[in-house]
């Protein structure tokens, strides 16, 4: 495990897809309506195995509905696999939905504190990094503004800044994240390159 940041061995995941039984016209007219539901089992992932080395950028590709997002959520510990094992080295920060966990009625500063605590960051570290997060997100004039007054681009920049300032061992991205304008995207790419140089993994 020393050379790898992630080890995935024979991971499988199923979900239940529930359906409501259709009511016939006769049942509807007679008032004899019984709400019956049934489900089918969807095999989303089956016996998935791979390793991600430290400092490696690892891409997961596939068709829509092939289980890419489910796999990332398992790596994030949001879902548990039905079978198989996952081992990770160091902190893992998921950026699966930009702004996930943010509250629209809280200010940018308060959301930084809340998000960082959820990511396991100490209060001391949060205080030290808050200014850097605001500066990286280019939101100096909006630190005390509630998120409900942010544009989607502003919220995205804040979420990305929170994730990278945590400095995780593994950063999980759901699809290619286009955050902000061209200048901000260039800044994000430089961060990714620096991550890789310092032995961080990106999935």
Predicted segments with their positions:
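Pre-NBD coupling/linker segments of ABC/ABC-like ATPases
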Residues: 2-47
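Conserved ABC ATPase "signature" region
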Residues: 26-34, 113, 125-142
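The feature captures the beta-strand-to-loop junction immediately N-terminal to the Walker
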Residues: 61-63
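Helix-to-loop junction immediately C-terminal to a conserved catalytic motif
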Residues: 76
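Conserved ABC ATPase signature
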Residues: 146-153
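A short, proline-enriched helix->beta-strand linker immediately N-terminal to the Walker B motif
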Residues: 162-173, 179
């Amino acid at each position: 495990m020393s050379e790898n940041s992630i080890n995935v061995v024979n991971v499988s995941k199923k979900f239940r897809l529930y359906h409501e039984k259709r009511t016939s016209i006769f049942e509807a007219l007679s008032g004899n309506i019984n709400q019956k539901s049934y489900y089918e089992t969807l095999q989303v992932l089956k016996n998935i195995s791979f390793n991600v080395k430290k400092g490696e950028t690892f891409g997961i590709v596939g068709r829509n509905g092939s289980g890419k997002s489910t796999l990332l959520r398992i790596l994030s510990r949001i879902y548990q696999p039905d079978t198989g094992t996952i081992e990770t080295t160091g902190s893992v920060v998921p950026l699966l939905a930009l702004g996930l966990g943010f509250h629209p009625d809280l200010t940018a500063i308060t959301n930084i504190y809340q998000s960082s605590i959820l990511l396991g960051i100490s209060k001391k570290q949060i205080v030290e990094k808050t200014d850097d997060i605001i500066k990286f997100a280019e939101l100096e004039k909006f630190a005390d503004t509630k998120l409900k007054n942010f544009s989607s681009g502003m919220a995205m920049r804040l979420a990305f800044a929170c994730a990278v300032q945590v400095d995780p061992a593994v950063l999980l991205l759901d699809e290619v994240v286009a955050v902000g304008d061209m200048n901000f995207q260039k800044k994000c790419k430089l961060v990714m390159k620096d991550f890789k140089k310092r032995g961080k993994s990106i999935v």
